[in-house]
Amino acid sequence: PGSRVVEAGTGTAALTSAIAHYIRPTGRVYTYEIRQEFQKNAKKNLERAGLLDVVELKEGDVTQGIEEKDLDAVILDMATPWLVIPHAYTALKGSGVLVSFSPTIDQVVKVVEALEEHGFVCVETVETLIRFMQVARGKTRPQTVMTGHTGYLTFARKAIMVQQES
């Protein structure tokens, strides 16, 4: 509760809604979407969920900058998240968290390189997948055929540079 979060890639506002529930009543989600039709649909979904009091919908491209400052977190679900890393660093408060979802490993590599270049620390990437199990006494195992899509979540924290007195 009370956190200030920027999300880029509002989509249908499913993740926006989850974040809003977590940070309310005193927090704020600023969610950016470049596609106007997605933003209209997201607004309807947020109205139905009763969450517009803690969500600010913004039509804009975060690769051009993030207006908000002193943020607790920046969450990216977009095609070119590495282009947002310098803006996220400026927008986050010290020790703020960045999370990026990428469907391809090539995107992950670009994100991690940008994070390291801009001074983020504690950079970790995990793969997300669903694997169904065949459960039977004495012979439980993963299903033989797995149809699904994997994705990758990359986490990082903004480091604060502290100058030591000499």
Features from the language model and the residues they span:
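Conserved SAM-binding loop of SAM-dependent methyltransferases across substrates and taxa
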Residues: 12-25, 89-90
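Helix-to-beta-strand junctions that scaffold the AdoMet/dcAdoMet cofactor pocket
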Residues: 23-24, 51, 92-96
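S-adenosyl-L-methionine
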Residues: 32-81
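Short beta-strand element of Class I
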Residues: 26-30, 98
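C-terminal lobe and adjacent flexible extensions of AdoMet/dcAdoMet transferase-like proteins
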Residues: 156-166
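C-terminal substrate-binding/active-site "lid" region of AdoMet-derived donor-dependent transferases
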Residues: 82-152
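Conserved class I S-adenosyl-L-methionine
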Residues: 2-11
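N-terminal Rossmann-like NAD(P) cofactor-binding module of classical short-chain dehydrogenase/reductase
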Residues: 6, 75, 99
